[in-house]
Amino acid sequence: IKLSGMVGESKTDILNLAGPVAKQWIEPFITLTKNAHNLDAQLESAMQAMNSAQLSFPIVAKPDLGCRGVGVKLLKSKAQLRDYLQTFPASARFLLQRKAPYQAEAGVFYVRYPGQEQGKIISITLKYAPSVVGDGTHTLKELIERCPRAGQLTHLYFPRHTQKLDWVPAEG
């Protein structure tokens, strides 16, 4: 892995390096490249690739190069896939991956120094997406700002939820 898995690494390249034991824990995925062809032709090509890989909706779409979930979306329909394709940058690669049935994502930090035959795991963490609970009084923007985790990442969450920031979620 060129940059040791840091920001800007290809998810496809990293996932393809997984050995047989690790692969059984990775949800199936396909990698596609947004091109300059007709949007509907790209959509049909993506649908055919999904069908060939036995993938179906809902499906997770994510940039091949990403950070902190930027550009990651849960797509529930062909229409949502079309919208994702339409807004995705030209010539960029993205993954369509089966949605995992778990609430958390595991992060494993493995280090092998040059010259060593074997490395070691130095950190394991479970990563949960921050969530807020409506109280019937505060807007989504206010709830995000008040959340200890999400409040530190408003630069990520505000752009994702622009259309809903003034919405007041019901209690619970």
PLM region spans:
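Active-site nucleotide/adenylate-binding loops and adjacent lid/helix of ATP-dependent enzymes
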Residues: 10-165
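Contiguous C-terminal substrate-recognition/catalytic subdomains in enzyme active sites
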Residues: 165-172
